[in-house]
Amino acid sequence: MEKSVAETENGDAFLELKKLPTSKSPHRYTKEELLDIKERPYSKQRPSCLSEKYDSDGVWDPEKWHASLYPASGRSSPVESLKKESESDRPSLVRRIADPRERVKEDDLDVVLSPQRRSFGGGCHVTAAVSSRRSGSPLEKDSDGLRLLGGRRIGSGRIISARAFEKDHRLSDKDLRDLRDRDRERDYKDKRFRREFGDSKRVFGERRRNDSYTEEEPEWFSAGPTSQSETIELTGFDDKILEEDHKGRKRTRRRTASVKEGIVECNGGVAEEDEVEVILAQEPSADQEVPRDVILPEQSPGEFDFNEFFNLDKVPCLASMIEDVLGEGSVSASRFSRWFSNPSRSGSRSSSLGSTPHEELERLAGLEQAVLSPGQNSGNYFAPIPSEDHAENKVDILEMLQKAKVDLKPLLSSLSANKEKLKESSHSGVVLSVEEVEAGLKGLKVDQQMKNSTPFMAEHLEETLSAASSNRQLKKDGDMTAFNKLVNTMKASGTLPTQPKVSRNVESHLLAPAEIPGQPVSKNILQELLGQPVQRPASSNLLSGLMGSLEATASLLSQRAPSPPMSQVFRTQAASADYLHPRIPSPIGFPSGPQQLLGDPFQGMRKPMSPVSAQMSQLELQQAALEGLALPHDLAVQTAPFYQPGFSKPQVDRTRDGLRNRQQRMSKSPAPMHGGNSSSPAPAASITSMLSPSFTPTSVIRKMYESREKTKEEMAPGMVVPGDGKEDTQKTSEENLLSSNPIPNTDQDSSTTNPKLSTLQRSSCSTPLSQTSRYTKEQDYRPKTAGRKTPTLASPVPGTPFLRPTHQVPLVPHVPIVRPAHQLHPGLVQRLIAQGVHPQHLPSLLQAGVLPPGIDMAPLQGLSGPLLGQPLYPLVSAASHPLLNPRPGTPLHLAVMQQQLQRSVLHPPGSSSQAAAISVQTPQNVPSRSGMPHMHSQLEHRTSQRSSSPVGLAKWFGSDVLQQPLPSMPTKVISVDELEYRQ
């Protein structure tokens, strides 16, 4: 009561407002005031002026009152409330059916319960009256007026004339029901009338259709527009049919279309399945099916249509196979066949394949329209599922390949030669098994000219065809087995070598052939075909870029290569090239000798990397990565940087986080760095960046500052000792590496958990900046597997390109990476010595992270990262010359260092050799696995202290990464603080 009275009061107040506008102070109420008024006793008294006829449930109902004032506004009878109307709906249905004027058969009862045209909106029992606001809905009256005018079916949705609209606005429920009955009756007569035109074949369909007409309003009326202006005029076909009367086939076809329209109008095609079947089965020339022969015109046996590869309907056994699988005869037409036309007229179920290769191609090509433009007759009906009639939109594969400048001559020319053989094999049932095909595909030669396009097709074929089965044979004489044809022609033309050839992409060097990921390749190829910027499949793109931007991975190769010459072949051009002995041990402390451990996983890596790949610019890489062409998992596998010792991290994390991080980083990374210049200072400079403080624990920051102070204090003039340390260092480092093998075992527990790493490692020997940065980020990013982290190499700060680390050592699951105590690249050592640092002092100085003040940093900075072998302590920023200030290292140095690490020899903690002495000492207790967290924290310090550096980490990493807490560390791992204290 209160509410309605309040409304009333408010209504009165507003009426007063209307009267008062002339007066200068009309009443204005705030919401609070009105609510307050509502609670007052006067508000609870019923004004005498309120007529009780507008009550609903004893409360005056303004809606009823309004309805009586503006009858057309929608309330059909002011006396009945909405609730009463809706309650009366169901009984009204039943009564209507019993109406003597109802000519429809008794099973209308079923119809009432069956889905109706408006089933989307209102369930089975909805009647027009339910939309109470529109119970005077245009449609019902329209049905009368317009029917009289043109005898048009209700579904045609003509715009209603105002006369019809206003007419009978006060109809009672019974009147409305009668109206509906009349409409239905008229519909029924209409249908009978049409049925008399000799359309005997549609009798069954008419019955169904008639049932579906219980509700005259098409669903889009009841669920859709509420005003005339919103009504869309959909012209009907019945008028035309009546006019054309006895025009035979033409009329029949149009009516078929109109029936379909009616079906869709009424029912969304739910109740009409049988009718559709009947129509489609009995009307072979129905325009709805545009045979796909339009797309793939048959050609004389001498010609070969490239698109035939993708037409599954030409594969003879396919239809029968599918029928066997589905257990259906070839006659049964799908009830949805009008939307999914089957180019092979056989009516076989092969059209029920989820999607044809053409469709797949279009989807990949992005050519698929959201709603495909309808074909010839599809304009006749509104279908939720786009019709198949869009022949013109099909992708012409041949055209695509031509656009991509793919040379098809060898393919096509070899076809005629193979034709007979293929025919025989297809008749005899000899078909490549999926495994064979896959094997063939894996070995595809990725030719720069051919650009994988042909392989892509093979791959695509394999995917689509193998879904059905390994039997792939073409039906027509002129068309050979799609698969055999493709594969054989490829083999014949040399596109598909029997033995996988070493592809020019680094991919094949890095990945064993079996690992070449199929998915990314196919996607990328498509991209290439479509003229996208990607120049190689993303996977190989990334890889080749990652590896390629490092001019030669001499370190990796030299470390692993069975023979020294190889490393020599790939000697880097970096300033430090002279330091590369053919067998320089890898920085990570894996001796070249005990390589057996590494051997298997890295076989892929042993393949020489072609310099060509080195040309890949990082931008391209970034593009590829950003475009997400390769699946994250594949990318991660392929691009995991192996020189990253910290990388014993489970692949899962890397794939999850790495891809995202890498992409962010890539998108932000500065112009591509030139990987070749490992010694150029510029890249180093570009690396300068700092970790945001939020990223670094306060204790670490404090330590950083303390150590910085300490460095400054300790800087003392150094003695110049021209050192011939280079060779000694190298030898010793090699020895150390050999001896360091045992150490790795400490890490084995963690690494064994990572069997997947081997693939990762295998996949990339080195990665350019994008990777690097990704790792720096990932290091932070990977808190979950703290145990797995290896302190050794903090990847250089994101900005730096990896200047071809000469010695990256991929992690191997079972060979933990050890970070030997002293690790300074011999070249660096030599320079330091040349600058007057006595070799004896190096270990202690380095351990403390301090170099004597006399040392000139410039040359050191110029050193490529590979030379600065200090893993833990980055070089201090150029401004503060101390050489290896542990925390304050500039990212630049970080990067440099990193590279150096990669190249440099890591000496096992215990080694007493001079190299050990010379190289920076990492506290020996840092277990190899402490890696990431530690590294990472280091990285943070280094970078974070580098707050002076212009480039902030934020530039490279998303805030999510920067704000993550440091990874938790297993007990074996030394925290940075401990590390510093021990020093």
Curated annotation (Swiss-Prot):
Ranges of Basic and acidic residues composition bias in the record: 52-66, 81-99, 651-660, 724-734
Annotated stretches, region: Interaction with CSDE1: 130-160
Extent of motif Nuclear localization signal: 194-210
Main location group: cytoplasm
Keywords annotated in UniProt: Acetylation, Cytoplasm, Isopeptide bond, Nucleus, Phosphoprotein, Protein transport, RNA-mediated gene silencing, Translation regulation, Transport, Ubl conjugation
Keyword Thylakoid among record annotations: no
Subunit structure: Interacts (via YXXXXLphi motif) with EIF4E. Interacts (via YXXXXLphi motif) with EIF4E2. Interacts with DDX6. Interacts with CSDE1/UNR. Interacts with CNOT1; promoting association with the CCR4-NOT complex. Interacts with LSM14A; promoting EIF4ENIF1 localization to P-bodies. Interacts with PATL1. Interacts with importin beta only in the presence of importin alpha, suggesting a direct interaction with importin alpha. Interacts with APOBEC3G in an RNA-dependent manner.
The protein's name in its UniProt record: Eukaryotic translation initiation factor 4E transporter
